[in-house]
Amino acid sequence: MPIITLPDGNKKKFDQPVTIMEVAESLGPGLAKAAIAGRVNGVLLDTCIPIEKDSEVNIITAKDQDGIETIRHSFAHLIGHAVKQLYPEAKMAIGPVIEDGFYYDIAYDQPFTPKDLEAIEARMKELVKLDYDVNVEIVSREEAHKEFEKRCEPYKIEIVDEIPENEIIKLYRHQEYTDMCRGPHVPNTRHLRTFKLMKVSGAYWRGDSNKTMLQRIYGTAWGSSKELKAYLKRLEEAEKRDHRRIAKQMSLFHTQEEAPGMIFWHAKGWAIYQVLEQYIRETLSLHAYQEIRTPQVVDRSLWEKSGHWEKFKDDMFTTTSENREYAIKPMNCPCHVQIFNQGLKSYRDLPIRLAEFGSCLRNEPSGSLHGLMRVRNFVQDDAHIFCTELQVQEEVSKFIDLVFEIYRSFGFDSVLIKLSTRPEKRVGSDEIWDKSEKALSDALDAKGLAWDLLPGEGAFYGPKIEFSLKDCLGRVWQCGTIQVDFSMPERLGASYVAEDSQRRTPVMLHRAILGSFERFIGILIEHYAGRMPVWLAPVQVAVMGITDRNAQTCQDVCKKLSALEYRTEVDLRNEKIGFKVREHTLQRVPFLIIIGDKEQQSGEVAVRTREGKDFGSMPLNSFISLLDEAIALKGRSGVS
């Protein structure tokens, strides 16, 4: 006779085992109709699963994030149902939930066309209208193998055969279509109303370029048509803000086939990069970091000692010379330990903070490369802090302050924080994990910050905090991190002399704020739609004359501003002033100076902004003061 405890603390007693749906029915027909799944003692389950003992139960509906995830997962299976009806020879692979949607990987001889996508979506809508029940059946591995063997589904068979023999498998049945999944899924297709298929792309089976190329159908699903429309609107805006598109308009950078995943920085894009780098350099110096530089090509033996060779060999670019094998560094940390290891260190020397703008290369799959957001060659704002166990909390606390200081400078006030704790497989004693996790959580709590706990999501060598930015479209970008490492310093022989004159291994804190310069610049371009804050703008001022008579004055003004290190360009083309103003506005130049005969005679300059605000005429020194004020605002000038 289970006693069910509800989220509000109320309890309900049942005379026999009860399903989640029956609990919902006991609370009212409206809730039962809306029920999609349930959490039983924190575990997300199908509504048909019986509850046999006292439990805490939360009914999940489309208003909950868990409900939306369940709906999206069910839509992935609905793709399978529709595709198998329309294209019986198709073979189904996998169909997981992703951010804002879902996809299904399918093997089919003919490429799916836009018309095929329309037909699949139409068939899905027809199936939804049937309001049929989605039934779940728990089977053994052998039974699942036979089921998919009967259906001639080789990809499903491959997955089934890799599942441990004693593990249960759930089969979900959509009428004549059967799929497998951990679940949960909606109990009836009446919950599957608001969706849209988005596109088709290629994807290798299991991400292995040596395996079959499949077709991936992407879709999105939401709890209401209003949410779907808002999402599609955001996508439309995101397309306008695509950093690759804006980079082409502004001549910031380009990529090309001869160097996949490598950036060709143009002068204007490189100007943004240099401002960013110098700002981080100066800020780190104020926070007592030492800037260092380490080799890019390092002997294989160091990567073997650090453990990277075993775990990341396939992601490394390697080369040989004089019968020695080298790797181009995919990360900086082992090299930073080498610098720490030079000379005897005392506890009095700690903490030591080593920072590097380290150029790294990783052999990312070509299909995953995406402008600045996913590259092979990137530069990290990387630093490593070597400290004692007792110093961890203080160093984390200082880093949190630094993170928020820098993010605010770029106009990001919404920062999401996650703390990842010990996984099952790990190094280090429970005692040191307890201390480290407490140090991280206490540092966050002392700042009064809200954060989410991710149990078991830490690396094997230590817990970590992740910092994610929310941009103007509500998209979340994970950028900053601080990671405790108990393993690498010991593996690479790092030590210091403690107060008791004994050798101790320091704790190593891996930390980054931007993540990589390339990706962060991509985020900034999209966040600001290319209209960078004045301090970051590749060209801060464009000077233009109305007639050829004003050319010399324009050049003089440009020289004066350039001498003061403002990024200035002069436009002396024989074009109408309206054309020039429009062109530099489209180039997102923050300030436009216009000089005609009137300004030339008065010694003043006419000033307007890219947003169209007209300041009228003013002395050049007054404009410089205006420019300085705008630069000092940094990211606080807002997003337009």
Swiss-Prot record:
One of its GO terms (biological process) is threonyl-tRNA aminoacylation. Its cofactor is Zn(2+). Residues 242-533 are annotated as: Catalytic. Its main location: cytoplasm. Its EC number is 6.1.1.3. It catalyses: tRNA(Thr) + L-threonine + ATP = L-threonyl-tRNA(Thr) + AMP + diphosphate + H(+). Keywords: Aminoacyl-tRNA synthetase, ATP-binding, Cytoplasm, Ligase, Metal-binding, Nucleotide-binding, Protein biosynthesis, RNA-binding, tRNA-binding, Zinc. Gene3D superfamilies: 3.10.20.30, 3.30.54.20, Anticodon-binding domain (3.40.50.800), Bira Bifunctional Protein, Domain 2 (3.30.930.10), Threonyl-trna Synthetase, Chain A, domain 2 (3.30.980.10). One of its GO terms (cellular component) is cytosol. Residues 1-61 form the TGS domain. Zn(2+) binds at residues 333, 384, 510. One of its GO terms (molecular function) is threonine-tRNA ligase activity. It is an enzyme of class 6 (ligase). It is found in: Cytoplasm. Binds 1 zinc ion per subunit. Disulfide bonds: none annotated. Pfam families: HGTP_anticodon, TGS, tRNA-synt_2b, tRNA_SAD. Homodimer. Belongs to the class-II aminoacyl-tRNA synthetase family. Catalyzes the attachment of threonine to tRNA(Thr) in a two-step reaction: L-threonine is first activated by ATP to form Thr-AMP and then transferred to the acceptor end of tRNA(Thr). Also edits incorrectly charged L-seryl-tRNA(Thr). NCBIfam families: thrS. This is Threonine--tRNA ligase. It comes from Prochlorococcus marinus (strain MIT 9303). The lineage of its organism: Bacteria, Bacillati, Cyanobacteriota, Cyanophyceae, Synechococcales. The gene is thrS.
